[in-house]
Amino acid sequence: MDRKMLKSKIHRATVTGADLHYEGSITIDLDLMEAADIIPYEAVCIWDVTNGSRFETYAIEGERGSGVICINGAAARLVAPQDLVIIASFVNMENAEAIAHEPKLVFVDDKNRMLESRKEVAGQATLKSVHWKN
């Protein structure tokens, strides 16, 4: 049996741009792509923490060290600069491999510089926690 598993995640990156007239994709700083083991043209899911939108596109490499996270094409209508997003990629693997699998999780600061790569802790609070207003 195959399972679809989280392969990698860039957690709470800040959107630096939204280019409606580019042909599609998400431009990601090459340093972050390498840290998260995401390659050019790999499918990625984008989850906008700020507004709740979710969509799938593909990654293209941005300038190394630039901190760029730019949503391109039609999906640019789903985000705004300064939104916080989670960028995730998935992989299918056999059950035995999936049991031992550990995804690459990359945590960034507000300038999209990598802070650390570590395991995710269930229920963990972050310094950037959103406080819901009624």
Curated annotation (Swiss-Prot):
Gene Ontology MF terms in the entry: aspartate 1-decarboxylase activity
Record's comment on post-translational modification: Is synthesized initially as an inactive proenzyme, which is activated by self-cleavage at a specific serine bond to produce a beta-subunit with a hydroxyl group at its C-terminus and an alpha-subunit with a pyruvoyl group at its N-terminus.
UniProt modified residues of type Pyruvic acid (Ser): S25
Catalyzed chemical reaction(s): L-aspartate + H(+) = beta-alanine + CO2
Alphabetized UniProt keyword annotations: Autocatalytic cleavage, Cytoplasm, Decarboxylase, Lyase, Pantothenate biosynthesis, Pyruvate, Schiff base, Zymogen
Active site (record annotation): S25 (schiff-base intermediate with substrate), Y58 (proton donor)
GO cellular component terms listed in the entry, alphabetical order: cytosol
Its job: Catalyzes the pyruvoyl-dependent decarboxylation of aspartate to produce beta-alanine.
Protein's name according to its UniProt entry: Aspartate 1-decarboxylase
Species: Citrifermentans bemidjiense (strain ATCC BAA-1014 / DSM 16622 / JCM 12645 / Bem) (Geobacter bemidjiensis)
Protein's gene: panD
